[in-house]
Swiss-Prot record:
One of its GO terms (cellular component) is cytosol. The keyword Transport does not apply. Keywords: Cytoplasm, DNA-binding, Transcription, Transcription regulation. Belongs to the TACO1 family. YeeN subfamily. This is Probable transcriptional regulatory protein str0195. It is found in: Cytoplasm.
Length: 241
């Protein structure tokens, strides 16, 4: 059993509520939409990267005006450049963190991430110090009960699917990252229209459990990292968070 299956099934509603209430998430999606639209056509039908970002923005309840503004900006003559980055580090008691960024100022972002680690009980590590303990996977979550039927649908569509789990009325599909879009198309072809999560995730090979002061310190560290405007994603190996 994938150790993250229970995690996705349990936190998806909480995640959606949190994202929907957080205007910072909107701004971060605005940047991501702009970058995707700028790198290709500003039309999701001819730009799969943009289509994927817009699908995720919908799940996070990003307002239409935020999306339209980002796409309009990409259509203009602006030459603002954003660079993807990844930082890795450690929290208390065996906890590991990966931070993905999208920034127009790499030096600023690197300094901010290092400060967030240092001031909140963590340590930033070298590139590769943590990521080898995580696997990149496609993750899809939607309402449903019959994991076996979904698994069969995906196999018939020649999707490289790793696992399908059903729990608490939700189905979680894990795919190889290159097959995430293929899996989505197969599910849509079989009548599945609404998705709670469609993400490329870094999934820990093992999880740790934190308690008491360690857990509070770790939560503060994650909050500090996620509060940075340039931080797009934070992955970690702490259970039940």
């Amino acid at each position: 059993m994938n150790p993250m299956g229970r995690k996705w099934a349990n936190i998806v509603a909480k995640k959606t509520a949190k994202d929907g209430a957080n205007s910072k998430i909107y701004a971060k999606f605005g940047v991501e939409i702009y970058v995707a639209a700028k790198q290709g056509e500003p039309d999701p039908e001819s730009n799969s990267a943009l289509k994927f970002v817009l699908e995720r923005a919908k799940q996070a309840q990003v307002p239409k005006h935020v999306i339209d503004k980002a796409i309009d900006k990409a259509k203009g003559n602006t030459d603002e450049t954003f660079v993807e980055g990844r930082y890795e580090g450690f929290g208390p008691n065996g906890s590991m963190i990966i931070v993905d960024t999208l920034t127009s100022n790499v030096n600023r972002t690197a300094a901010n991430v290092r400060t967030a680690f240092g001031k909140n009980g963590g340590n930033m590590g070298a590139s590769g110090s943590v990521s080898y303990m995580f696997d990149k996977k496609g993750v899809i979550v939607f309402a449903g009960e019959d994991a076996d039927a979904i698994f069969e649908q995906l196999l018939e569509a020649d999707v490289d699917v790793e696992d399908v789990e059903a729990e608490d009325g939700s189905i979680t599909v894990y795919t190889e990252p290159t097959d995430l879009h293929k899996a989505l198309e197969a599910l849509r072809a079989n009548g599945q229209e609404e998705f709670q999560v469609t993400e490329l995730e870094m999934i820990p090979q093992t999880e740790v459990t934190l308690e008491g002061e360690d857990l509070e310190t770790f939560k503060g560290l994650i909050d500090a990292l996620e509060a940075d405007d340039d931080v797009q994603k934070v992955y970690h190996n702490v259970a039940d968070m």
